[in-house]
Design a protein with these regions (language model features):
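Aromatic/His-enriched, Gly/Pro-containing loop or helix-boundary segments
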Residues: 1-2, 117-125
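Noncatalytic modules at the cell exterior or secretory-pathway interfaces
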Residues: 2-13
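Active-site acid/base region of carbohydrate-active enzymes
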Residues: 7, 17-50, 56, 63-80, ...
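Hydrophobic alpha-helical segments typical of transmembrane helices
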Residues: 97, 136-137
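Short coil/turn linking the two alpha-helices of tandem helical-hairpin repeats
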Residues: 141-142, 217
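Short, intrinsically disordered, charge-balanced linker/junction segments flanking boundaries
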Residues: 207, 214-217
Length: 217
C-alpha cells in the first residue's frame, strides 16, 4: 500500500530548513505519452493537467485506486483503462498489468478484487471488481490487435465465468457479492455500505457477469 499524505514531518535536523532545502519528486511508472492538449480556457488546461497528474500518480506497476485515502490495487480501474490507451501508449505495461491479475487468480477460478492482495488473508471475490480483468484483456486486444492476449488469458477468464455461475448465481442472476454501485451522480458515496439505494446490487453484478460472458464468447 502507498499511503497518501497531506503533511510531512521531518526530524533530526540541527537547523530550521527553508522551503528551498526540501525537494519532492513524483515517482510513477515510466510513461509514453501520445499528444497533448491545450486551449484558450485556463480552467480546462488546469483540469487536464490535474487529471493527467492524478493518472500518473496512479501508475505504480499497476493501477492504484482511491489515491486520497487507500491506494490499493483494486481491479475496478482496469474496466476503464481503455480510455487511457490513446494517451498512454504503454502496451508492455498494460499487458504486464493483465498478467499480474491472471497470476493472482485462485485455484477455484475466482479472481481477487485487489491485486496485489491486502496483507494477510485475501477477501472474498466480488463480481464488480473481478470482472474488470476480462474487460481489460478485451480492450487491450481491440487496441493492439494482438491475438496472443486472448490465448494467454482465455482459460483464466473462462474459469472466472464458471466460478461466478457455480458459486455466485441463482439461475442467471448474480446474488452473491458485497460491492455495488456506490457512485450515484450528485450524491456522496455510500461509504458505510458501498452500495446505492437506487441501484440493486444484483443488477450491476449480473450486467458485469453478462459482459464477461460476451467477452468470453
Amino acid at each position: 500500500i502507498y499511503h497518501p499524505v497531506q503533511y510531512l514531518q521531518i526530524k533530526g535536523l540541527t537547523n530550521k530548513p527553508s522551503i528551498d532545502d526540501l525537494q519532492g519528486r513524483i515517482v510513477h511508472t515510466d510513461e509514453n505519452l501520445e499528444g497533448d492538449f491545450s486551449c484558450s480556457n485556463e480552467l480546462f488546461n488546469t483540469i487536464h493537467n490535474n487529471v493527467n497528474r492524478t493518472l500518473s500518480n496512479s501508475l505504480k506497476g499497476f493501477l492504484l485506486d482511491c489515491l486520497h485515502r487507500e491506494p490499493y490495487g483494486y481491479n475496478e480501474p482496469a474496466s476503464i483503462a481503455a480510455s487511457l490507451f490513446t494517451r498512454k501508449h504503454m502496451p508492455l505495461f498494460w499487458r504486464k498489468y493483465a498478467t499480474d491479475i491472471r497470476l493472482a487468480a485462485r485455484e477455484d477460478g475466482s479472481v481477487g478484487d485487489v491485486v496485489p492482495a491486502f496483507p494477510g488473508k485475501p477477501r472474498d471475490p466480488d463480481v464488480s471488481q473481478g470482472s474488470a480483468y476480462a474487460m481489460l484483456v478485451w480492450y487491450l486486444y481491440q487496441a493492439y490487435d494482438d491475438r496472443s492476449l486472448l490465448e494467454e488469458h482465455y482459460e483464466t477468464i473462462k474459469d472466472w465465468v464458471d466460478y461466478i455461475k457455480k458459486y455466485m448465481c441463482e439461475g442467471p442472476i448474480v446474488t452473491v457479492g458485497w460491492l455495488g454501485d456506490h457512485m450515484v451522480p450528485g450524491k456522496a458515496p455510500g461509504y458505510e455500505k458501498w452500495r446505492s439505494d437506487e441501484t440493486p446490487q444484483s443488477l450491476s453484478w449480473t450486467a458485469l457477469y453478462y459482459r464477461n460472458i460476451l467477452i468470453l464468447s
